[in-house]
């Protein structure tokens, strides 16, 4: 198998988003309609439910919002600093996930080739809660 990247497969930004900003992002995202998460598909029609694999509630963050722009800027920064230098032409709508007691998202790889999302090259995870307040979330 030919190696595509000579750089790391992940990028971890040690600098944290300030706690106050995290709290504001949570408040903004809780205003969006929350729904039970599926494991694949960009819309309700394509959503597959598999509660042995993923159990959480999510909201879609609309494009053009302050939160989406903040995430997009972090993706661009990681793309440059990790020296991936992908040409990012578009981003899927980001998800805000709320994990309550008993909720989880098991280990997985985003490897499905989906003709509807040929631009999908990078993923971002931002933990907004204090790590002392939950178990898991490791990448």
Regions found by a protein language model. Give the residues of each.
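Fe(II)/2-oxoglutarate oxygenase catalytic core
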Residues: 1-139
């Amino acid at each position: 198998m030919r190696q595509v990247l000579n750089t790391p497969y992940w990028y971890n930004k040690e600098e944290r988003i300030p706690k106050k900003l995290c709290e504001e992002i949570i408040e903004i995202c809780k205003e969006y309609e929350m729904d039970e998460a599926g494991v694949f598909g960009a819309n309700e029609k394509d959503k597959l439910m598999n509660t042995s694999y993923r159990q959480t509630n999510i909201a879609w963050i609309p494009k053009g919002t302050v939160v989406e722009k903040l995430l997009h800027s972090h993706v661009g920064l990681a793309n440059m600093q990790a020296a991936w230098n992908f040409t990012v032409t578009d981003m899927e709508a980001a998800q805000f996930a709320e994990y309550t007691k008993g909720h989880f998202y098991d280990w997985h790889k985003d490897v499905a080739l989906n003709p509807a999302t040929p631009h999908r090259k990078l993923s971002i995870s931002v933990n907004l809660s204090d790590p002392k307040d939950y178990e898991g979330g490791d990448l």
